[in-house]
Amino acid sequence: MRLCITGGGTGGHLMIAEALVEACANDGHEAIFIGSTSGQDRKYFEQNSKFSHVYFLQTTGVVNQRGLGKLKALWLVLRAFFASRAILKKHNIQATYSVGGFSAAAASFASLSRLIPLFIHEQNAVYGKLNSILKPFATRFISAYDEASPIKGYPVKDIFFKNARLRDEIKCVIFLGGSQGAKAINDLALSVALELEARGVKIIHQAGERDYERVKSAYEELGVKAELCGFTKEMPSLMARADLAVSRSGASTLWELCANALPSFFIPFPHAASDHQYHNAKFIVDNELGWCQREEEDLRATLLSILPQNLADKSKALMEYSSRDVAKKMITDVVMSLNA
């Protein structure tokens, strides 16, 4: 099979694309990538050897633009649309998988115009604008939050499943402020640090590179020994050591925590598009798999109320809920659809 994978802009979308191309390579399928010169697409895939070819077309997001900016963005998408048509023809592409984001627009519409089956993965509980437009025309629409989705789950690296373990008593809490930092989560960690130390609970804290020095100084003033980092590539092993996570609820991190069977207290980023982080976390709460609270609420009181709880039921439920090999299932589904 010859597959085009398109989409990106941000890391969450691109991690799904990465999972899909790895599944393609493992099953002996050829994949090309069509992305954008904007965003993080080049950083992720310019040197990726699993794609036979990669293309970065000049596009930008359309939704948040106004006036002349929107017209220019639409013109760039139109130009990239014709370039994508030529690329799809050149490689004799049989199917296209969109992982969403503004980078996906040109190749997705080009695929439909060439009658190439379009498969879509939606990473968030609230559909992105582009995916909402394309969904009626898609051969398959995959979402971990949709009961009607033919494939359940979210593409997560296998290491998070391998490191999964059943949690019960809380002996270690990991605070995930993200690579850029999340002041609300960092401040929450500092506000409970003395209480956690008094209870004998260890602290692992990814504070983000921007806020690292402030948080480091604050722990020193408190006299609390926390395992602190700004950014780390060792997230799977850090998660594995924790019994509770305090985190934002971007889709990739949320489902990695679920795969690890790590019960989590989610504090959504309040300015996410369409408030999707809140709705991602609400899905987990509605399934009784975790906790969620807005930044402006009493985060400290909620976290302290969680600490005495036995987490075995939630951790076990997470193990049973999370699906393994989702990327492989998505690629197998494309092959079966083409052969039907």
From Swiss-Prot:
It is found in: Cell inner membrane. It is a peripheral membrane protein. GO terms for cellular component: plasma membrane. The keyword Cell wall biogenesis/degradation applies. Pfam families: Glyco_tran_28_C, Glyco_transf_28. Keywords: Cell cycle, Cell division, Cell inner membrane, Cell membrane, Cell shape, Cell wall biogenesis/degradation, Glycosyltransferase, Membrane, Peptidoglycan synthesis, Transferase. Its EC number is 2.4.1.227. It catalyses: di-trans,octa-cis-undecaprenyl diphospho-N-acetyl-alpha-D-muramoyl-L-alanyl-D-glutamyl-meso-2,6-diaminopimeloyl-D-alanyl-D-alanine + UDP-N-acetyl-alpha-D-glucosamine = di-trans,octa-cis-undecaprenyl diphospho-[N-acetyl-alpha-D-glucosaminyl-(1->4)]-N-acetyl-alpha-D-muramoyl-L-alanyl-D-glutamyl-meso-2,6-diaminopimeloyl-D-alanyl-D-alanine + UDP + H(+). It is an enzyme of class 2 (transferase). InterPro entries: GlcNAc_MurG, Glyco_trans_28_C, GlycoTrans_28_N. One of its GO terms (molecular function) is UDP-N-acetyl-D-glucosamine:N-acetylmuramoyl-L-alanyl-D-glutamyl-meso-2,6-diaminopimelyl-D-alanyl-D-alanine-diphosphoundecaprenol 4-beta-N-acetylglucosaminlytransferase activity. CDD domains: GT28_MurG. Pathway: Cell wall biogenesis; peptidoglycan biosynthesis. GO terms for biological process: carbohydrate metabolic process; cell division; cell wall organization; lipid glycosylation; peptidoglycan biosynthetic process; regulation of cell shape. Gene3D superfamilies: Glycogen Phosphorylase B. Belongs to the glycosyltransferase 28 family. MurG subfamily. PANTHER family: GLYCOSYLTRANSFERASE, UDP-N-ACETYLGLUCOSAMINE--N-ACETYLMURAMYL-(PENTAPEPTIDE) PYROPHOSPHORYL-UNDECAPRENOL N-ACETYLGLUCOSAMINE TRANSFERASE 1. This is UDP-N-acetylglucosamine--N-acetylmuramyl-(pentapeptide) pyrophosphoryl-undecaprenol N-acetylglucosamine transferase. It comes from Sulfurimonas denitrificans (strain ATCC 33889 / DSM 1251) (Thiomicrospira denitrificans (strain ATCC 33889 / DSM 1251)). The lineage of its organism: Bacteria, Pseudomonadati, Campylobacterota, Epsilonproteobacteria, Campylobacterales.
